[in-house]
Amino acid sequence: MKLRSFLMVCVSALAATALVFAQQNDDFSKVQIKVTKVSGNVYMLEGAGGNIAASVGEDGIVIVDDQFAPLAEKIRDALRNLGITDKPVRFVINTHYHGDHTGGNVPFSETSTIIAQDNVRKRLAEGSVSGIGNGEGRKNNPAPKAALPIITFGHDLTVHLNGEDIRALHFPAGHTDGDAIIFFPKSNVVHMGDDFVRYGFPFIDIDSGGSVQGMIAGCEKAIAQLPPDVKVIPGHGALSNLDDVREYIKMLKGTTAAVEKALKQHKTLDQMKKEKILAPWEKSSGGFINSDAFLETIYNSLTGHANHRFLRHN
């Protein structure tokens, strides 16, 4: 599978059918799990899909997100190889419901308790529509029962493990409507899920309750509430800090203001694309979301349109 197609599967593969597609068509045998110590007892794991945070200590292990099912044993091995504990992963906290962050829920559910915000369970259980921002949407079938979180929360939840009061905080209407950032206060590390990414323009899943306004608000809330020297694990990309988040917010606000200005001038979406109104931020289009796709996402977010013009049913 070509890289662009793989990334689109990683970010937009939602629930059971899309996960099966990804697992059958990508060779996960070649994926290696890279482990980086972040701070305290928190580590960052990179493989395929979203970044994983892991708190590893004498009480056991809690991980944030779990990538894809075929990687579950590799993730377990990477954690065991740290030599800190032989205890299993006790808890998995999902930052949101997309398949590249929840794809390992089924194998991890055998020994772990899955935790997520209320809307994550709802969307996994019912199946959802997702649009990339290029006018296409996908309707996914419900996830298997084993993939569903068995503990859910509305606004926040705390897990007391390894000397940490690990806090999951709901950030509504950002990347999706079920987003949560996970803060490890003693280690001074936060996992921000896909509300903050380092691959270029972000994917905002409007069809799943996300919005550019909510993403900006969530990132600003994180900066206001977190310690200034906190280490930031993004949903995708390199380990970061709050200055990186500030630059990200600056890009989101600038692109949004450009679209708002064009809307006030009664310009159509096609006119905005032809005029390349996001050209000043072109350096941010290095990922799989190009400037036209991100422009359409902002336009749809501001005007209340869905991201998809048609649905592809699996």
Residue ranges and their predicted role:
Residues 28, 80-158, 177, 257:
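Active-site HxH/HxHxD metal-binding segment of metal-dependent hydrolases
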Residues 41, 55, 65, 79, ...:
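Divalent metal-coordination and catalytic microenvironments
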Residues 14, 18-23, 224-229, 238-314:
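Accessory terminal helices/loops
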Residues 52, 72-76, 86, 105, ...:
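Extracytoplasmic/secreted envelope proteins and their assembly/folding machinery
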Residues 1-11:
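Bacterial N-terminal signal peptides that target proteins for export
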Residues 60-62, 68-70, 158, 165, ...:
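Metallo-beta-lactamase
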Residues 33-81, 180-184, 189-194:
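Conserved beta-strand hairpin/beta-sheet module of binuclear metal-dependent hydrolase folds
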Residues 23-29:
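Cleaved targeting-peptide boundary
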